[in-house]
């Protein structure tokens, strides 16, 4: 039976997965084998038919899980998480939620993401200064369930930029989704303040966003401001991320060493050449679910297909698809992460990105899975211990009913995810009897 204890369960002597198809996310085709987990690490991998058949008796003191032919794969990783985005129909209900309620909702969103099989993720921005930081702390302490997480602070933006939400007659910083700055010295102070709060990364809004009124192809932050942010972040060994839809903003990311480039829809050939030359130092996460759903699936919330705003996002979606195909051909690392957290992009549906990468961006199923596992470990700056099934790696694992290589859509079906293990402990333990009926039906 499954254990519903959200704090996770594990055998003190480890867990042995037998009779599984191992999708190790190295690029190798899945193979039959068994995987031994001890503590929070993968201790041993054995290729070939299981030596234990359907036995559920302990082996070396470990609990044996007979996979009955299910797929064992790394946990999914979202490169662009907003855990404090509360599935609201717009920015105001996110920003105006009082902090006490907002903290609880953030923890609720973290559980939704983990329930969907995402065992890790990089925070892309928080709605309030310490929501991500406290969320990560509580998850790491085992007090609440959630993915392995890197915390962000609010986005840093310019006057009039994305995140500057206050009206002219009420110029109050509390009304802004981002932290509004003007000039390098204000950037310096803001970066230092966020690092004091405990963030893992600094996020800059280097381009506009159609839904806010500033065009996505605009690049409002000066070179001096970006350079200051990069300098201050490097002083404290913090990673930089950027909202960068415009070509100019993508080039700023490359010039100033901003590792994580979010969106990049309008990158021109010069930007692509620059990015290809520096592809070992950067990641791109297009946030394509936001474009698709805002353009086509948000009518219930006032964005009608065919409206000017919808058509603007359709135009960007077309550009994004072509740009990502070009990047993919150039070998640039593209990660999943669809900007989930609005009513029309709800948390917990994150695995839809994998299907979209296959159907729209020209990825093979294996490539799309690598974008959500192997490259995810790398964008977490944990590529030597996360995102693949290898001996010594962290035991963040999914047991999946079926073959995701044959049909990536099964990763969106929570009923097909038979088990979720994070850090060597089951968040969702397999229901052995039900599993056998399902897999032998």
Feature names for model-found ranges:
Residues 235, 304-308, 316-403:
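His/Asp/Glu-enriched, well-ordered alpha-helical/loop segment
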Residues 106-132, 145-155, 199-210, 238-239, ...:
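Divalent metal-dependent hydrolysis catalytic cores, especially in the metallo-beta-lactamase
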Residues 88-90, 132-133, 161, 212-214, ...:
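Histidine/acidic-residue-rich catalytic or RNA/ligand-binding cores of hydrolases
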Residues 83-102, 114, 159-176, 209-222, ...:
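Active-site gating loops and adjacent loop-to-helix segments of metal-dependent hydrolytic enzymes
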Residues 20, 372-374, 391-438:
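C-terminal cap of metal-dependent C-N hydrolases
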Residues 137-155, 217-242, 283-286:
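Alpha-helix-loop-beta-strand connector modules within alpha/beta enzyme cores
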Residues 67-141, 159, 224, 256:
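Metal-associated gating/positioning segment near the N- to mid-region
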Residues 2-16, 22, 26-73, 93, ...:
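Histidine-rich, glycine-flanked metal-binding segment
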């Amino acid at each position: 039976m499954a254990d519903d204890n959200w704090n996770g369960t594990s055998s003190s002597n480890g867990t042995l997965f037998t009779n599984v198809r191992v999708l190790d996310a190295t690029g190798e085709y899945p193979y039959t084998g068994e995987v031994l987990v001890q503590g929070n690490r993968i201790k041993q991998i054995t290729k070939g038919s299981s030596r234990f058949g359907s036995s559920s008796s302990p082996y070396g003191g470990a609990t044996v899980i007979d996979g009955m032919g299910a797929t064992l794969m790394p946990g999914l990783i979202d490169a662009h998480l907003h855990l404090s985005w509360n599935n609201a129909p717009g920015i105001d209900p996110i920003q105006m939620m009082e902090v006490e309620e907002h903290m609880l909702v953030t923890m609720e969103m973290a559980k939704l993401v983990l329930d969907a099989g995402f065992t890790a993720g990089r925070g892309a921005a928080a709605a309030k200064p310490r929501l991500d930081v406290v969320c990560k702390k509580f998850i790491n302490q085992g007090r609440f369930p959630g993915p392995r997480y890197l915390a962000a602070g609010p986005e840093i933006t310019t006057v009039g930029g994305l995140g500057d939400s206050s009206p002219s007659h009420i110029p109050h910083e509390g009304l802004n989704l981002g932290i509004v700055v003007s000039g390098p010295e204000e950037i310096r102070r803001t970066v230092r303040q966020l690092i004091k709060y405990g963030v893992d990364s600094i996020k800059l809004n280097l381009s506009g966003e159609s839904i806010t009124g500033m065009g996505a192809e605009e690049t409002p932050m000066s070179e001096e401001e970006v350079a200051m942010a990069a300098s201050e972040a490097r002083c404290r060994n913090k990673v930089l991320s950027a909202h960068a839809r415009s070509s100019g903003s993508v080039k700023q990311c490359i010039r100033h060493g901003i590792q994580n480039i979010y969106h990049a829809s309008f990158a021109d050939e010069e930007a692509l050449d620059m990015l290809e030359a520096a592809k070992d130092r950067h990641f791109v996460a297009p946030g394509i679910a936001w474009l698709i759903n805002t353009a086509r699936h948000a009518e219930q919330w006032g964005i009608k297909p065919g409206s000017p705003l919808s058509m603007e996002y359709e135009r960007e979606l077309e550009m994004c698809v072509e740009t990502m195909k070009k990047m993919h051909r150039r070998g640039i690392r593209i990660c999943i992460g669809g900007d989930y957290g609005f009513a029309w992009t709800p948390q917990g549906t994150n695995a839809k990105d994998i299907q979209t990468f296959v159907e729209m961006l020209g990825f093979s199923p294996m490539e799309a899975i690598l974008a959500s596992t192997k490259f995810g470990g790398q964008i977490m700056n944990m590529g030597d211990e996360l995102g693949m099934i290898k001996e010594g790696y962290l035991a963040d694992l999914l047991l999946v009913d079926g073959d995701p290589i044959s049909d990536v859509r099964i990763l969106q079906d929570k009923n097909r995810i038979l088990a979720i293990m994070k850090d060597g402990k089951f968040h969702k333990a397999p229901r052995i009897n039900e599993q056998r009926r399902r897999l032998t039906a």
